[in-house]
Design a protein with these regions (language model features):
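Active-site and substrate-binding clefts of carbohydrate-active enzymes
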Residues: 2-210, 333-581, 588-592, 636-638, ...
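CE4/NodB-like, metal-dependent polysaccharide N-deacetylase domain
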Residues: 44, 50, 58-63, 272-314, ...
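Loop/turn elements at helix/coil->beta-strand transitions in domains of secreted/extracellular proteins
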Residues: 63-64, 220-223, 251-255, 289-293, ...
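Acidic-and-aromatic substrate-binding clefts and catalytic sites of carbohydrate-active enzymes
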Residues: 207-211, 231-239, 296-304, 324-330, ...
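Metal-dependent polysaccharide deacetylase catalytic core of the NodB/CE4 family, i.e.
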Residues: 220-300, 345-351
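Conserved short loop/turn motifs at secondary-structure junctions
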Residues: 230-233, 263-265, 293-303, 384-390, ...
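Acidic, His- and aromatic-enriched active-site or binding-groove loops in soluble protein domains
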Residues: 242-258, 309-330, 340-342
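C-terminal (or distal) subdomains of carbohydrate-active enzymes
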Residues: 307-312, 335, 504, 508-515, ...
Length: 987
C-alpha cells in the first residue's frame, strides 16, 4: 500500500514562522527537503500535493503519510511520535546530504511499498518539478508577508499537478509541458491577485580575475541578463586572450560595469584627475567591447558624496551604491533611488537589497524579501550577487521559475532597468557625512606615499594651468599653432612621440554649433599627466604603497623641469622694454592659481627692492649672508599672473616694522600671534592680534596603549634646547629640540621648527622625529600624532573632501585637504599638506596621525587663522615658488600682469585645455570652476582676452547652456559645491 500524503515536518508551524537567523546548513537542508518532496515520481504515486506540518504529536497525527524530517526538526521528533506514526501506517524518513540523495532515498523507500510505473522521464523532469516546489514555497511567503491569506484553488492546482506527473509517467513530453506550465501560470495568477507590480531581478557576477575559457563559456552560455563587475580596463592588454571579449560582444544579455581603478575615492584628489581616469576607462570599453558602459560599479569602494556629478559628467547614466567588501555606503529605505549630491546633481542608483546567491540559506526566505519589496518599495528590486561560477542550486531553481513565469520576478539588464524606471520615485540627498570612513591602513610606507601623492597632484594641476596659459599666449601674441594631436608629449624637449597602442579618440565638443572648434588639444594633457593618474591609482592599493612611491617620486621630479619650461616660455612671450637696464638682476615669478598668492622669498641675491603697490612687494628686509648682500621679501603675485622683482640700487626709505620673533617663545605678525611653551616646545596658543582668547593649541605626542578601564593617555614633550634660527621684520623662525617621554621612559627625540612671515595667516610647523619606540605592527591605538585642541567647544568642525565642505564626524576621517574650526568671531584651520589620517576626539581634540618609516619621520603642515581663500591656501602655501632668475629688461606692461581671475574669491578656476584644431592657433580654452564654500553664487571670470562666446559643457564637450558675457567677464551661475566646465571662444 502506498502513501496518501507527502509531509515535511517543520520546526515551526509554517514557513513564515522559521527564523531568518537559522544556521546556514539547517536552512539549506530544509529547502532541499521541501523541494525533494516535489519529485514527479513521488507525486504520481501519492496522488497528492506535498504539504508541511509542525513537528509535534497533534500536527503529525496523520495516516498513511510519508513524513520527511529535515535536520532542523530531527530533535523534535520524539520516540513516541515516531511510534505513533508507525501505528498510523505512516513512516518518517530523515533528510540526506543533498536534495537528490533525499529524493532518491524516498523513491527507494516507495519502491519497497508499491511498485512504481517505470519511466525514463523521471530524472529529466525532476528539476522542473523541484523548481515548481520552490515557487510554491516562495509564493506562500510572499502572501503572508503581504498579510493576506491564500486564495489559491488548491483542488485545481492539485489536479493540474497530478496531470503533469501522469504525463511524465507516460513519457508524453507535450502534455507534461502543458500541464506543468499550467501549474506555474496558476501560481502567477495567485500572486497577481494580491500584487500585480513587476519585480525586477538582477544577476550581478563578481570577477576578481579575467575569466578563463571554461568559465567564459559557462558564463556567456546563460540566456538570462547578467551584470559583470570587475577591473576590466586593467585586464585588457594587446596580448590578452580575446575569447571572453568576443563572447561578451556576441552576447547581448551581458553588460559590463563601468569603472576600473577606484581613483575617484581619494578624497583630496583634484576632480580633473578623477574625470580623466573615468574618461580613459570609457574609451577602453568602447574600443574593446564595442559599447560604452552606462552603469558605474566597482568591487572596491569608489563612490563618495560628489560621485553623481562626476559620473554624469563622464557619460554614466546610473550607478550601484553598493560596497561589495563591507556595508559601508549609506543605505536607503528604497532599493531604487534618485541619488542627489550636495551640489544638486542627481543620478539613478540602487542602494541595497543584495542577496548572496552563493549561499543556499539566502533563498529560504526569498519570498519574504520579495514581499517586503512589494509592500514597501516603489520599484521592487533584488540583486542576486555571486562570484563567477559560484552560484548555489536554488539560483538554478529561480532561473527555471523566471523562464516560465514572472511569479518571483523577471531578469532584466541593468541599462533596461534604469531606462524603464527613470522617474525619480524616491529622491534622496546623501551628504558627505553620511558616507563611510575609508579604510585606514597605518603602514608607514602607505602614509608616506600619501604625502607624495598630495604634492604630485597639486603640482601637476599647477603645471597644466601654466601649459594651457602658455599655449593661449602663443596663439594670442604670435598666432602660433597648436601642436599636432598626440598622446605622448615629452616635457623636456617637446618631442612628439605617438603611441600606436593607445586608442585615437576625438572628443566632440558641440552638437550643431558651427562655431564650436573641432576638439581640445590633447597635447595639453601629455603623457606626464596620464602617468600621474596611473601612479595615483597604483599608490591607492595598500599592497603597492612602497613600490608606488618610487614612480610617484619620479613623476614629482619630472614636474620640476616641466614647470621651468612653462615659466621660461611665459617670460619669453612678454614684451620687454628696450631702454631699461638688461644687466639688472631680476626674478620672474608665476602664479598658476586663480587667486593672488602671497610668497616669502628668502636670501635673494639682490641689494634691495622697492616696497609699493605697483611693485607688488608687501615687505622686505636687506641683510648680508657671508660676503653677499641678500634680501628677504614678501610679494603678492597676481591671480594666474606674473611678477618681475627687480634689484633696486638706489637708497629707499622703508617703514620700520617690528620683528616677527619679538620675544622668546613668541612669533607674531599683523594677522596671527603664536606662543610656545619654553619647557616643552609645544604650541601653547594662537591669538588674533588685539583680540583676547586663545584660539588653538597643539603638541607632538605618542598615544599610549590603554590600560584597564581608563581612557587613553599621551606622552609629554620635554624640551632640551631652543634656537632662534632667524628673526627680522619679514620672517621669524624658532627651533625646539627635545624628547617624547612617558614618565621616566624616553619614547623618541624631536625637532620642531615654527616659522611665520610678514603678511601670512599661516603658522608653518616642520617636525622631525628620530629614535621612536613604537610597535612595528599597525595599531590605531598606539601611534605618533600631532594633537590639536581648541578652546570653544561650540565651534563647528568641518573638513573638505572631494572638494566639498562637510561637518567632521567623531572618529577617523581619511584624506581631508583642509580642516576648519568655525567659531563665532574667528575661523581656525589645519592645513594637513598630505597628512591623511585624522581622528576627532570629544568636542575639541583632534589627532593627526604622522607617518613613520624606520622609527623616524619628517612632516610639514600649517595652522591658519581667518584665511580669505582657505581652499587655495591649502594648495599654494606649501608649493615651491614658480620662479626663475633672469637678467632681461623690464616688461613693458610693468612689473606684474594677470591673465585669469575670478570673483568671488573662493571660486577655484583651473585651465583644462586649449580649444582648436591641431596646426591652427587656439580658438579658445576650456576651464573648470569649483565652489568649495557651499554657497550658491554667480562667478565672474575676468580674462586677458575678449571672449566671443562661452558655454557650460559636460565631460564629452556637449553644450548645456550659453553664458552671459558682460564687460569682458563670463558670468557662470554655480550651485553650492558645484563644479562646472566652461568652453570660452575668443573674438
Amino acid at each position: 500500500m502506498t502513501w496518501k500524503r507527502l509531509i515535511l515536518a517543520l520546526p515551526g508551524g509554517a514557513p513564515e514562522d522559521l527564523s531568518e537567523a537559522m544556521a546556514a546548513d539547517l536552512a539549506e537542508d530544509l529547502l532541499a527537503s521541501w523541494t525533494a518532496l516535489w519529485h514527479p515520481e513521488l507525486i504520481h504515486q501519492a496522488q497528492t500535493i506535498p504539504e508541511w506540518k509542525r513537528s509535534d504529536p497533534s500536527a503529525l497525527d496523520v495516516e498513511q503519510a510519508l513524513v520527511l524530517v529535515p535536520k532542523a526538526s530531527q530533535s523534535l521528533m520524539e520516540t513516541t511520535l515516531r511510534e505513533r506514526l508507525t501505528v498510523l501506517e505512516s513512516e518518517a524518513i530523515e533528510s540526506r546530504s543533498d536534495r537528490l540523495s533525499t529524493a532518491s532515498a524516498m523513491r527507494a523507500l516507495l519502491a519497497t511499498r508499491s511498485p512504481s510505473t517505470p519511466s525514463a522521464c523521471w530524472d529529466r523532469w525532476q528539476d522542473e518539478f523541484f523548481a515548481l516546489g520552490f515557487a510554491y514555497w516562495q509564493l506562500h511567503l510572499i502572501i503572508r508577508q503581504l498579510r493576506y491569506s491564500s486564495t489559491l484553488n488548491s483542488v485545481l492546482f492539485q489536479e493540474q499537478l497530478l496531470h503533469a506527473a501522469q504525463a511524465v509517467a507516460k513519457e508524453d513530453e507535450a502534455e507534461a509541458e502543458r500541464w506543468l506550465q499550467s501549474c506555474f501560470d496558476q501560481l502567477a495568477q495567485e500572486r497577481d491577485h494580491h500584487f500585480a507590480q513587476a519585480v525586477h531581478l538582477i544577476d550581478v557576477v563578481l570577477l576578481h580575475r579575467p575569466p578563463d575559457d571554461s568559465q567564459s563559456k559557462h558564463l556567456t552560455s546563460a540566456t538570462h541578463a547578467q551584470f559583470w563587475i570587475g577591473d576590466f580596463p586593467q585586464w585588457i592588454s594587446p596580448d590578452s586572450s580575446g575569447n571572453w571579449l568576443e563572447s561578451i560582444r556576441e552576447n547581448g544579455q551581458i553588460d559590463l560595469a563601468g569603472g576600473g581603478d577606484p581613483l575617484a575615492v581619494i578624497p583630496w584628489l583634484e576632480e580633473s584627475f578623477a574625470l580623466e581616469q573615468l574618461a580613459e576607462n570609457r574609451q577602453i570599453y568602447c574600443q574593446h567591447f564595442g559599447r560604452a558602459p552606462e552603469v558605474y560599479a566597482t568591487f572596491a569602494p569608489s563612490l563618495h558624496a560628489n560621485s553623481p556629478r562626476q559620473l554624469l559628467a563622464s557619460g554614466y547614466k546610473s550607478t550601484l551604491l553598493l560596497d561589495w567588501q563591507a556595508a559601508r555606503y549609506p543605505q536607503s529605505s528604497q532599493a531604487k533611488i534618485y541619488w542627489e549630491a550636495p551640489d544638486g546633481s542627481c543620478i539613478d542608483a540602487i542602494s541595497n537589497q543584495v542577496i548572496d546567491a552563493a549561499q543556499v540559506a539566502s533563498f529560504l526566505h526569498l519570498g519574504t524579501r520579495i514581499g517586503k519589496q512589494m509592500d514597501y518599495h516603489q520599484v521592487p528590486t533584488l540583486l542576486l550577487t555571486h562570484w563567477a561560477g559560484q552560484s548555489s542550486w536554488p539560483m538554478e531553481d529561480l532561473l527555471r521559475v523566471a523562464r516560465r513565469s514572472p511569479l518571483l520576478g523577471s531578469w532584466i539588464r541593468l541599462p533596461e532597468y534604469f531606462a524603464s524606471t527613470q522617474r525619480p520615485y524616491h529622491q534622496e540627498r546623501l551628504t558627505a557625512s553620511k558616507f563611510p570612513k575609508q579604510p585606514l591602513p597605518v603602514d608607514g610606507s602607505q602614509l608616506a606615499a600619501d604625502d607624495v601623492r598630495w604634492s604630485v597632484q597639486r603640482d601637476m594641476t599647477a603645471v597644466r594651468n601654466l601649459s594651457v596659459l602658455l599655449q593661449q599666449l602663443d596663439g594670442w601674441l604670435g598666432r602660433q599653432p597648436l601642436p599636432q594631436v598626440s598622446y605622448d608629449w615629452h616635457w623636456s624637449d617637446d618631442t612628439l612621440k605617438p603611441d600606436p597602442t593607445r586608442p585615437q579618440v576625438t572628443a566632440e565638443l558641440g552638437s550643431n554649433d558651427q562655431e564650436t572648434p573641432a576638439s581640445p588639444s590633447t597635447s595639453c594633457q601629455p603623457a606626464l599627466f596620464l602617468k600621474v593618474g596611473r601612479c595615483l591609482a597604483l599608490s591607492w592599493q595598500e599592497d603597492a604603497a612602497i613600490t608606488a612611491r618610487q614612480p610617484l617620486s619620479r613623476v614629482a621630479r619630472e614636474i620640476v623641469p616641466a614647470a621651468r619650461r612653462c615659466i621660461e616660455g611665459l617670460r619669453d612671450r612678454m614684451p620687454h622694454s628696450s631702454d631699461s637696464l638688461a644687466s639688472k638682476k631680476r626674478l620672474f615669478l608665476v602664479n598658476p592659481w586663480s587667486g593672488p598668492r602671497r610668497l616669502l622669498l628668502e636670501n635673494l641675491p639682490l641689494q634691495a627692492v622697492e616696497e609699493s603697490e605697483s611693485t607688488r612687494v608687501y615687505a622686505s628686509h636687506s641683510h648680508s649672508q657671508g660676503d653677499q648682500a641678500v634680501v628677504d621679501v614678501v610679494v603678492d603675485v597676481p591671480p594666474m599672473g606674473i611678477l618681475q622683482v627687480s634689484d633696486e640700487t638706489r637708497v629707499i626709505k622703508k617703514k620700520k616694522l617690528p620683528l616677527i620673533a619679538r620675544e622668546p617663545g613668541v612669533l607674531g605678525n599683523e594677522f596671527i600671534e603664536a606662543h610656545f611653551d619654553l619647557a616643552s616646545g609645544r604650541l601653547k596658543g594662537t591669538y588674533a592680534p588685539n583680540h583676547r582668547g586663545n584660539r588653538l593649541s597643539g603638541m607632538l605626542a605618542v598615544r599610549l596603549p590603554e590600560h584597564g578601564s581608563g581612557g587613553a593617555s599621551y606622552s609629554q614633550m620635554k624640551a632640551t634646547g631652543m634656537k632662534l634660527l632667524k628673526s627680522n621684520p619679514v620672517v621669524g623662525r624658532i627651533l625646539f629640540q627635545g624628547d617624547l617621554v612617558d614618565g621616566s621612559t624616553t619614547l623618541g627625540h624631536y625637532e620642531i621648527e615654527y616659522s611665520l612671515f610678514r603678511g601670512s595667516r599661516v603658522l608653518d610647523i616642520a617636525v622631525h622625529c628620530t629614535g621612536l619606540q613604537l610597535p612595528a605592527a599597525n595599531d590605531l591605538k598606539h601611534y605618533l600624532c600631532w594633537r590639536t585642541a581648541w578652546a570653544n567647544i561650540s565651534g563647528i568642525v568641518s573638513l573638505w573632501q572631494h572638494g566639498t565642505k562637510t561637518t567632521m564626524p567623531t572618529g577617523w576621517s581619511y584624506c581631508p585637504s583642509l580642516l576648519e574650526i568655525d567659531e563665532a568671531d574667528h575661523r581656525e584651520y589645519l592645513l594637513p599638506n598630505g597628512l591623511s589620517r585624522h581622528r576627532r576626539l570629544d568636542d575639541r581634540f583632534l589627532d593627526s596621525l604622522l607617518p613613520i618609516v624606520n622609527q623616524e619621520g619628517a612632516f610639514w603642515f600649517g595652522i591658519g587663522l581667518d584665511l580669505p581663500r582657505p581652499r587655495q591656501t591649502c594648495l599654494d602655501h606649501f608649493a615651491k615658488p614658480f620662479s626663475i632668475e633672469e637678467s632681461s629688461s623690464e616688461m613693458q606692461t610693468g612689473p606684474s600682469a594677470w591673465f585669469v581671475q575670478c570673483t568671488p574669491s573662493h571660486i577655484l578656476v583651473e585651465l583644462v585645455a586649449s580649444l582648436g584644431r591641431p596646426g591652427e592657433p587656439p580658438q579658445g580654452m576650456r576651464i573648470r570652476l569649483q565652489d568649495h564654500a557651499g554657497r550658491s553664487t554667480v562667478a565672474a571670470v575676468d580674462l586677458f582676452r575678449k571672449p566671443r562666446k562661452a558655454s557650460t559643457i559636460d565631460i564629452a564637450g556637449k553644450i548645456w547652456t550659453d553664458l552671459v558675457i558682460e564687460d569682458q567677464k563670463v558670468k557662470v551661475p554655480l550651485k553650492a559645491h558645484e563644479s562646472a566646465m566652461v568652453d570660452i571662444l575668443w573674438e
